[in-house]
A protein has these predicted regions:
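Canonical leucine-rich repeat
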Residues: 60-65, 84-86, 105, 125, ...
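Ankyrin-repeat and related helical/solenoid repeat scaffolds used for protein-protein interactions
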Residues: 310, 321-393
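Feature marks extracellular polysaccharide-active and adherence modules
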Residues: 53, 77, 87, 98, ...
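Conserved hydrophobic beta-strand positions in leucine-rich repeat
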Residues: 50-53, 74-76, 95-97, 114-116, ...
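Conserved hydrophobic position(s) of the canonical leucine-rich repeat
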Residues: 47, 71, 81, 92, ...
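N-terminal capping/linker segments that flank leucine-rich repeat
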Residues: 1-75, 90, 126-131, 140, ...
Length: 418
């Protein structure tokens, strides 16, 4: 009985009180100071952090953890967890849970940070009304439903790996500022009343066909890559700085209201004509690769740093006014025969394998290099087809390196040194 045990002077570290042998082992090792096989009131009070590694056990029970009313942080690594009840751990602030399966979970409403890496969680992650919640992290695994409606959550994000999640419910989360998930199998998203959102990233967003962001007037960054969305309105999102609709079904967009846009990506979409922006001189990154676009007008794109026009239908590319360019990708752009980058002194990467380029002018680009962390240079690799003349500067330190690399790859390159 919980109330009897909680009011007693001590709790025996037995299988009856703590069915998990891994939990008993941790308690004996770290908290049974006098090694009498029991936890005194003082020892129980001192249990503020608990780390239970049960990966070698087939299943684990957390029965007994409810006694630790002073517990602040719990790290649990397990295989099969049938049920977790942390509702009585009122002071619990941080939960880190990594498991193969979790079938049922009940949490303390005073949680601040949670991290889940669960391969299979068929139950609902229920954070409704959690007024102290700040961050939810989901890592590699399959989850059914996340419901954080009415909570104080500020950030919902993934860890290092994509997740599978069917439902996201976060209505009326007044403090929510960022939802950043690389998520598959998504069927439903409800963010109504969450109007303070600044970042919304739903990459690989499964079966989602519609998304209404009209009331998210503070939105700065929006990504809906890999969705089935065919139309998307951002007319009300005047603070938008980054938009990524790559790998979606979208064919056109009205961006006339988005004067603060800096990053625009629409790779592998049905867009067949360059999307018009109201303030082209603010654009720093443009990715229109893998589309049927046949022409690009970049005369006013004076701040452009990164351009990806790989596998497009363009026949010419004028970037004379784009003096800030750092990377240019035109890989597989077979109809492009000439590329003049003589004005680009800040250039580091030019990726043009399998393109139709016969002449490439990089005479003022002394920074092209793939021997540091700043870029991949020309990205000469076996398997690509390159046959062209490259005009380079005599002071370019990497010339011999790339000449040798081109020979090793079997490329037919004529080097003109100026």
């Amino acid at each position: 009985n919980y109330s009897e045990a909680a009011s007693s002077r001590q709790i025996s570290i037995t299988q009856k009180n703590f069915p998990s042998k891994d939990l008993r082992k941790e308690l004996r090792k770290s908290y049974d100071k006098n090694k009498d096989g029991k936890l005194s009131k003082a020892e129980i009070k001192g249990i503020k952090y608990l780390n239970v590694d049960s990966k070698k056990s087939k299943s684990i029970s957390l029965k007994g953890v409810q006694y630790f009313t002073n517990l602040r942080s719990l790290d649990l690594y397990a295989v099969n967890v049938k049920s977790i009840d942390l509702s009585k751990n009122k002071k619990l602030r941080s939960l880190n849970l990594a498991a193969t399966t979790v079938r049922k979970i009940k949490l303390s409403k005073n949680l601040h940070d949670v991290y889940f890496a669960v391969e299979k969680m068929p139950c609902t992650l229920d954070f409704r009304g959690f007024k102290k919640l700040d961050r939810i992290h989901l890592d590699q695994g399959h989850y059914n439903k996340l419901n954080a409606s009415g909570s104080s959550v500020r950030l919902i994000a993934q860890g290092n790996y994509p997740v599978a999640l069917k439902n996201i419910l976060a209505q009326n989360c007044k403090k929510l500022r960022s939802v950043d998930l690389d998520v598959s199998q998504l069927k439903k998203v409800n963010l109504n009343g969450t109007n303070g959102l600044r970042v919304l990233k739903l990459n690989r967003s499964g079966s989602i066909k519609k998304l209404n962001v009209s009331k998210m007037k503070n939105l700065r960054e929006l990504r809906v890559g890999g969705s089935k969305i065919t139309t998307l309105s951002v007319k009300k999102n005047k603070k938008l700085e980054e938009l990524d609709i790559s790998d979606s079904k979208i064919s056109k967009m009205d961006l006339s209201a988005n004067k603060k846009l800096k990053v625009l990506r629409y790779r592998n979409t049905k867009v067949s004509k360059m999307l018009s922006v109201p303030n082209p001189s603010a654009i720093e990154e443009l990715d229109c690769s893998e589309t049927k676009i046949s022409s690009l007008d970049l005369r006013k794109y004076t701040a452009l740093k990164h351009l990806n026009a790989s596998q497009t239908k363009i026949t010419s590319l004028n970037v004379q006014n784009c003096r800030e360019l750092v990377t240019v990708y035109v890989r597989g752009t077979t109809k492009l025969s000439k590329l003049d980058l003589s004005n680009q002194a800040k250039l580091r990467d030019v990726i043009f394998g399998d393109s139709g380029i016969k002449e490439l002018d990089v005479r003022n680009s002394l920074l092209i290099c793939d021997q540091d962390d700043l870029g991949s240079g020309f990205d000469f690799m076996p398997g690509f087809k390159i046959s062209c003349k490259i005009i380079v500067n005599k002071n370019w330190k990497e010339l011999n390196y790339y000449q040798n690399q081109a020979k090793e790859c079997g490329f037919n390159i004529t080097w003109q040194i100026v």
